[in-house]
Amino acid sequence: PLPPYLNRETESSDYETYQTVYSEKKGAVAAPTAGLHFTERVLQKLQEAGFKQDFLTLHVGAGTFQPIKVENIVEHRMHNEQIVFSRKNLQTLVQHEGPIIPVGTTSMRALESLYWFGVKLGKGDSEFFIEKLYPYQHTEILPSRQESFAIILKFMESNGIEELTGETEIFIFPGYQFKVCRGIVTN
């Protein structure tokens, strides 16, 4: 569906035109709207300016557009979203030294969730599901971004995994300590 703020019904042409230029796989409930503004030309200019790019598979859930209707933000129900990372994605993240700035909140949630999966793996838990409040429940000394991603990469290599699929309901609200992202590009 289209986001509610467009105030119109879905048209058949939306299935082709309401997509990012880099969309490859089907499965999302909605398009990741922050990426809709990027054209092939804009992506090329960013690359020429020295910005490194990598692409994730995001299956945006209906909850993306769900308003918060509770007084206590912790009580807000988050929908699970499926996220997929390739071994190449992990290799890129492990080797990257600079800031990571995702396009859109779904990408941000995916990257932050990936970090927390590395934390879980380091503790012997290989279930790739990040509960809504998991990050707020862990204040112990935590691994760096690269250490967490290296744990995941080693797990993938040891188990012959080319593509890692998980689910997240991570909820980022004031007080969250970012482990991966240092900014965001969004609309």
What are these regions (language model features)?
Residues 1-187:
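Surface-exposed, charge/polar-rich loops and edge strands
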